[in-house]
Every structure is written in structure tokens, then in C-alpha cells.
Amino acid sequence: MEQIYVQTEDLSVGYHGKVLLSDIAMKVKPGEILVLIGPNGAGKSTILKNIIRELHPIGGNIYIKGRRTDEFTGKEYAKTMSVVLTEKIKTEMMTCRDVVAMGRYPYTNYFGKLTKEDEEIVTESLRKVSATDIENKDFSQISDGQRQRIMLARAICQKPEIIVLDEPTSFLDIRHKIELLDILQEMAVRDKVAVIVSLHEIELAAKVADYVMCIGTDKTIEFGRPESIFTDERISRLYGLTHGTYNSLYGSAE
């Protein structure tokens, strides 16, 4: 029987005890890409923050490889899951390579010393995101788009079984958006990594997703294959499009 990497059970999420979304049901297997879509403020980031343990569920449970999230130690979780968020991290005198190398720390000893193999993994992670040319630059001095690529490299460097990304295509030009999604697809297909990612671009979501979870303006949740979710009527309803329509041919709202 194939293992399930991420599964929710009667999940309710929100803030300060107030439920924002309830009855959230998802199931992600190794090698699958789940894309969360929906308008701003719908709750995509809130769901992701519960998966990565930044927030605690108000109700129900989240299971990672059959274990509740609260049963993992911090180090165990870091070896299992890597995360790319939209929030900017604070760094002091760190090069881009230093930031990427942080992805290896769950595997290091008490002193945090990297082995030769660790250093090779750092280099390979930088290469995958086309960032070897900026590895020695100060992380605080590079562009937002370059920072996003470095944060993806750090996540890759962790060698995760699950990767969670919150709007990773923000700040990227179209070339680097496509490159990023190609990397995620490669991780899913070749390494059997389970990918959970939120995206704004419906047309990109339709191309990369194995499954889609769409959170509507009215907090309704639709889950299914892209071909069943990305229909003119369903997307128009979920996004509350009253003066325009979703064009499934072009993957855009008009």
C-alpha cells in the first residue's frame, strides 16, 4: 500500500481560536504536487502555516507519514519537510551560500560543521536554481527575485521528503517562474518529493498540479484534479467573478 506523506483529518484552521476554514481534507502522496489557489485572504497561507507548525490547528489533525505533526521533534521535522515562505528572513553578514548551507544543519553534529558531502549538496542546490553566480554575494544586498531563488536552494539543500512553498513565484520574472516550477516537477518525479505550493497564477497551477485545492471568496473549498477544478463556471464562482469570466483555454480571468 502506497504511503501518504501529508493527510488532514477534520482540520479547522484560523487565528486566536476563531475558525477561518473548516472541514479541510487533503491527501498528498510521494511524487504528487498539490497546488493551493484562491484570492488574497482566502486562507491559503493559513493552511500552509498549520502544516509547517507555525500555527496549531483549531480542530482536527494533520498527519505526516502517518504521525501527527506534534509527535515530531524539531530536528525530525526539518529532515522531513523544507519550507519556502514569502516572509523575508533576517541575516547578518551572510553570503547566499551561507544561507543555502543552513539547509544542511539538521544533518550536522553538535558543532554544526559541514562535511565535504554537505558542501557538494550546497553547490548542487545553487546550481539547480541557476544561482552559482551570486553564491558569494551578501544575501541582504540581492534582489527580491534572487532571494526567492536562494530560499528555494536552501529548501532543496535539506533533501526533504516534503516541500511546502507559499507563493514562491512572487518577485520572479516569467523565465524564473517556469524554471522554479520545472525544478519542483523534477523533485516530484525523480525524487518522489511531495510538493504543496500556493500560487496566484491559475495558468501555471493548471500546468504543474496533480491536484488542486481552491479556496473561494466564501470560504468554500474545492479539491480535485486540475481538469475538474479549472472550469469556467467553477473558477468564476470560487473567485466571485461577477463582471468577468474565467477562460479555461487561456487560464486567465477576463
Give the ranges of each region predicted by the language model:
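Helix-to-loop junction immediately C-terminal to a conserved catalytic motif
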Residues: 52
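H-loop (His-switch) and adjacent beta-strand-loop-beta switch element
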Residues: 212-225
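Conserved ABC ATPase "signature" region
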Residues: 101, 116-134
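The feature captures the beta-strand-to-loop junction immediately N-terminal to the Walker
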Residues: 37-39
